[in-house]
């Protein structure tokens, strides 16, 4: 399995992450984009697909209602992320765990953003570009962390929890929290839970 992860956060609480996993043995790819704190929009914006065909070239994926590409401009220094998709807006993070998958308001989501390494070296850097949600375009310029296949996932972070998201995975979920720690906003990658009493397939 190979994976790439971009976390980003702006000081006002607008934040998100993008993850692409190539699961070669299963011949599928997993793709996630989650956004929180979007100006003038309540709740969590979700684009999640666990049944994407493996890319035919580079890191470009296509599925129904989804196109995304992660492009390496310079290894461990500069990446570009593009997305055109339809996602859903959830009123509450827990709505992601309902039987049958995420159910919410259908909404257009787009990304045209870049990550560039910072003075401290990877994975830390800066993210800038445009995030599109519905008919609105939001320019972002903030901190970002890019984890390529050679960089371990981020771990738990302690601090004031600003937002939480849940990502259904198999019979459980991954919990990610946006945390204010040491004056900065950071994404924490927390535990994977097994959700009891659920017989449906959350893939």
Name what the model sees in each region.
Residues 1-203:
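Structured soluble/peripheral alpha/beta segments that form catalytic or ligand/cofactor-binding pockets
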């Amino acid at each position: 399995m190979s994976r790439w992860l971009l976390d980003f956060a702006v000081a006002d609480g607008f934040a998100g992450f993008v993850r692409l996993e190539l699961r070669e043995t299963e011949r599928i790819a997993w793709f996630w984009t989650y956004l929180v704190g979007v100006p003038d929009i309540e709740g969590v914006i979700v684009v999640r697909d666990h049944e994407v065909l493996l890319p035919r070239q580079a890191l470009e994926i296509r599925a129904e209602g989804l196109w995304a590409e992660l492009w390496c401009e310079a290894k461990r220094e500069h990446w570009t992320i593009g997305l055109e998709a339809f996602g859903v807006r959830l009123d509450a993070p827990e709505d992601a765990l309902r039987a049958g998958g995420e159910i919410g308001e259908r909404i257009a989501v787009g990304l045209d953003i870049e990550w560039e390494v910072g003075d401290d070296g990877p994975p830390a850097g800066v993210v800038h570009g445009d995030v599109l949600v519905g008919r609105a375009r939001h320019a972002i310029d903030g901190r970002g962390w890019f984890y390529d296949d050679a960089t371990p996932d981020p771990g738990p972070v302690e601090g004031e929890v600003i937002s939480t998201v849940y990502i259904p995975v198999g019979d459980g979920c991954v919990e990610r929290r946006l945390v204010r720690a040491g004056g900065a906003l950071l994404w924490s990658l927390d535990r994977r839970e097994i959700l009891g009493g659920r017989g449906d397939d959350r893939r």
